[in-house]
Amino acid sequence: MAAIDIGDVNVVSRSYGLSAGYLHILKTNPANLSGKITQVQLYAKTGYSMANVRVGTCYIVSGTNYSSRDYEDIGTVAAGAVRTFTVDLDVEAGDVLCCTFTSGQLCYVEPGGAGIRYIFGGSIPFTNEETSNASTTGDLSFGGTGATIEVSGTNAIFFGMNF
């Protein structure tokens, strides 16, 4: 299995915080491979714990329209430090991370990344939703890692005559 990374690879405290009530899409560091994201890290701004956090993977449909691929609820992200969560998210090469939360702030920096898009009042899952530009160079303190999935011949189905 090969390693997958997506989003911010250096999740740290940042000077600014993005507010709740939006679906945030992080364009920085799209997934390098297809497989499963098994861990995500987030940094809630000091003093602003995040509640009802949902994280996911998403992809560009066309232009500025995105659709979600997979998501998981992770609950509360306590403020003031990197928090790590175990997840099971499907990901395809080129996908990016997205998240929603009902209160608190997610750390971000400007400039420092490939940009942040948003949907006001958006939720996950979503299909072919038009997004707005929050920042062309921003980066969120939000990243993930995982691995490719290898199919073993033991559980595979083969068609044809030559085995």
Where are the model-predicted features located?
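Short proline/glycine- and polar residue-rich coil/turn motifs
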Residues: I74-A81
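Exposed aromatic-hydrophobic patches
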Residues: A81-L89
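Beta-sheet-rich sandwich/jelly-roll-like modules and their strand-loop junctions
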Residues: M1-S68, D88-A93, T100-G160
